[in-house]
A protein has these predicted regions:
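NAD(P)-dependent Rossmann-like dehydrogenase/reductase catalytic/cofactor-binding core
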Residues: 219-294
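Small-residue helix-packing motif on alpha-helices
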Residues: 40-41, 65, 81, 213-221, ...
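Rossmann-like NAD(P)(H) cofactor-binding subdomain of soluble oxidoreductases
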Residues: 24, 32, 38, 43-44, ...
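Internal alpha-helical scaffold of NAD(P)-dependent oxidoreductase catalytic cores
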Residues: 110-130, 146-184, 196-234, 278
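Eukaryotic N-terminal low-complexity, Ser/Thr- and Lys/Arg-rich leader segments
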Residues: 1-29, 48-56, 63, 89-93, ...
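Short pre-catalytic strand/loop immediately N-terminal to key active-site residues, enriched for Gly-Thr
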Residues: 132, 182-187, 238-243
Length: 294
């Protein structure tokens, strides 16, 4: 998760970003990176040093970073959230600010319990921070992320929403969905790159088995997948696209029959369903959840 935070910071700093058309009144102009690992400072500085924006790195000092920030990005492991938010002084330092969480499976309600454990029976304090849940993915490194912003209740102010959208539009595309859709969004968008990478690798393996050099096979598979997604994003329905390529008696329909006989369609759909359940369980603090279903 640290790499995701680094890539989002890198993209937000970039002048080549393509943000949401609605520009917030204030945009990020200074960046503070907090990490518990001493070696992270050198990595962050190396990754972001060529951007002409102030950058400050802190090790084992989240409190100072939160105090100095207007908007805070929480990008630790899900199981580390309670310790970070429950640390002395963090609640006061976050008062009136926006906290953006990219933790898989962890709900806004859970984060509120970690941050305000003494207030849950009587309600949140008036100066409570606004917690926003967002699910980006690793393609943020190349500004091709698919980020899902949870629709907050009550809604964010116009400027808060514009700021969060601006930040994540800088690293790719953004959609807003209700809280009930966040676990499946984690499975499809957060875990999706790994699933699609496996499919891409399998296609390249098949081509290598039939004589293509590895480098060319990987390039061809990646570009073919990229071109296909481009057509879909341009409005082409996947089923229509598939049929357009499938001439009667041709090699495409022959290959598709192998996929259908192997129930690949159902396996891929089940992959998303399984990952959704796992994301939900991880957010509740469960362990070894991948060994509980068959």
């Amino acid at each position: 998760m640290a790499s995701l935070a680094e890539s989002k910071t890198r993209a937000a700093l970039s002048p080549d970003s393509t943000p949401d058309p609605k520009i917030p009144k204030r945009v990020p102009s200074k960046f503070i990176a907090c990490d518990a690992w001493g070696g992270a400072e050198a990595i962050v500085k190396k990754a972001l040093s060529h951007y002409n924006f102030p950058l400050k790195t802190l090790t084992n000092d989240n409190l100072t970073g939160v105090k100095e920030a207007d908007i805070v990005l929480l990008s630790c492991k899900p199981q580390g959230a309670q310790g970070i938010l429950g640390a002395e002084g963090i609640q006061a330092a976050l008062a009136g600010k926006v906290l953006v969480s990219i933790l898989a499976g962890v709900t806004v309600a859970q984060l509120e319990r970690y941050l305000y454990p003494k207030n849950m029976s009587s309600g949140l304090p008036e100066n409570a921070c606004r917690i926003v849940r967002v699910m980006p993915n690793t393609a943020s490194f190349v500004r091709e992320s698919m980020s899902v912003i949870e629709i907050s209740t009550p809604p964010l102010t116009d400027d808060q929403h514009a700021l969060v959208s601006f930040i994540f539009s800088s690293i790719g595309r953004v959609v807003s969905l209700p809280a009930a859709n966040m676990d499946v969004s984690t499975a499809l968008c957060g875990s999706g790159p790994a699933f699609f990478a496996l499919m891409l690798e399998a296609a390249a393996d098949g081509a290598v088995a039939m004589g293509l050099p590895r480098a060319e096979a990987q390039l061809m598979a990646a570009q073919t997948m990229r071109g296909t997604t481009g057509l879909v994003l341009n409005g082409e329905h996947p089923a229509v696209l598939k049929d357009k390529v499938s001439t009667p008696g041709g090699c495409t329909i022959g290959g598709l029959m192998v996929l259908e006989e192997a129930a690949v369609r159902g396996a891929i759909a089940r992959t998303i369903r399984e990952a959704t359940v796992v994301a939900s369980q991880l957010g509740q603090g469960a362990t070894n959840v991948n060994g509980t279903r068959h």
